Amino acid sequence: VSGSWNLVCKLFERTLRSTCNQTSSDYQVIVVCHEKPQVSFDTSQVTYLQVNLPLPGADYASKEKDKMLKMQHGLLHAKAINASHVMFVDADDCVSQHLAQFVAQNPNENGWFLGRGFDYQENFRLLRVRHRNLHLRTNTSHVIKLDLLEPEMKLHPDEVKRGDCVLYHIDTAAILKQRGTPLKLLPFRGVIYITDNGENMWWSQQNIASKNNGIQSILAALKSSYQSFITQPVTDSIRDEFGLYPIDAS
């Protein structure tokens, strides 16, 4: 499924450490995977749920389907442990350490979409501030009251696909609003979206498209130059809040 299992494990371990760096202990992490990643970090608040799903193909649609099926498995386990809210986290992103405490302080809310946060370029180790709509760019983007996801838990695997399904992050907030259970904007920056590590599905898809088109390659180079003017280094406070540290891809 991945081009580099070693890199996947390194990225996942950073995400796991970030997710478990909460200021509140009132949380559980459910890792849904085909194969358990090889990491040196462990805690009793992490549960590994290995699933026997068909391996996805190399295309984007197949990978998205695989991700949504894993999310469904995670939902069912979250229900079994009586979770109040759930948040789906991609295996390479980093999240704010204040999320669990904030949710615990607002137990009756439908949930939140993470519209604000950062993009992070691994190769350059730079951040770009995102002031809006970050929840449309990454799957690490919503905290949802578990009861609102009952329809998704009851879907047959063949029905798990983009459409009237909350599990596709681009549609999540809009569908919940249509159902009469809207989410609120999270009132602080909640996620660092890792964009260019090579294991990111959206980024990889765009990179392939650029390499297959000369004009797109030029535009990508211009975009890269522009990025240097709109990015910032990682500060100590951001590093501490999000558990972000450099990854050696070798």
Which residues are covered by each model-predicted region?
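Short beta-strand-to-loop acidic/aromatic patch adjacent to the donor-nucleotide binding site
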Residues: 81-94
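C-terminal catalytic/acceptor-binding lobe
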Residues: 157-250
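Short, acidic, metal-binding catalytic loop of nucleotide-sugar glycosyltransferases
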Residues: 8-26
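Short, high-confidence coil segments that cap the C-terminus of an alpha-helix
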Residues: 83, 108-110, 181
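Conserved catalytic core of nucleotide-sugar-dependent glycosyltransferases
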Residues: 96-165
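Conserved short acidic donor-positioning loop in nucleotide-sugar-dependent glycosyltransferases
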Residues: 19, 33-37, 91
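Short, flexible/disordered intra-domain loops and linkers
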Residues: 1-10, 58-65, 157-165
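Active-site-proximal specificity loops/subdomain of glycosyltransferases
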Residues: 35-83
